[in-house]
Amino acid sequence: MSTINYDLTKIKSFIFDVDGVLSPDCIPLSVEGVPMRMVNIKDGYALNLACKSGYGLAIITGGDTDAVRLRFARLGIEHIYMRSSVKINDLNDYMNKTGYKPEEILYSGDDLPDFHVMQAVGLSVAPADAAPEIKNIAKYISHKKGGEGVARDVIEQVMKAQGTWMNDKAFGW
């Protein structure tokens, strides 16, 4: 695991894109043409633990499927922005609603629609297989590819740095 070169004690909120970050960058389609997503169980556990431990969490994605909304809502994520055509607008809405400052936010994105959000937050994270333009501006490039544990990688590092990883909420769903 590589280490993040940022003061992780500042992070109070995690925001993730879905396609290419929390799910692989390939999307299988049902016979009806409905996109389906695969998600990483360890990412889910880390997201849930972060929620239970008091961190702010949000999803900002261009996609819009009930399965994605339901999955992340069940993990405890309240702020889910679907069909986000201009992601920086949703980041600003999230900050206005929650009061988080840019330097308190970690955002992970993988492609050009994430560019402006990644420039606006304190800690920008890219999966190992992100677009070159995104890797160029990311403050941390995970050793994990999209859908293979990016969220777990960064949440675990932040929570360990803050002494909240192995807390009493860590031993159950």
Question: Which positions does each model-derived feature cover?
Answer:
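Asp-based phosphoryl-transfer active-site loop
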Residues: T9-I27, M118, A151
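Substrate-recognition element of Asp-dependent hydrolases with the DxDx(T/V) motif
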Residues: L47-R71, Y81-M82
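Short coil/turn segments at beta-strand junctions that form active-site/ligand-binding loops
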Residues: K10-K12, Y55, E103-E104
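Non-catalytic pre-domain segments flanking phosphatase-related domains
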Residues: M1-V18, A161-W173
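Short secondary-structure boundary segments
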Residues: V18, G62-G63, S84, A128-A130
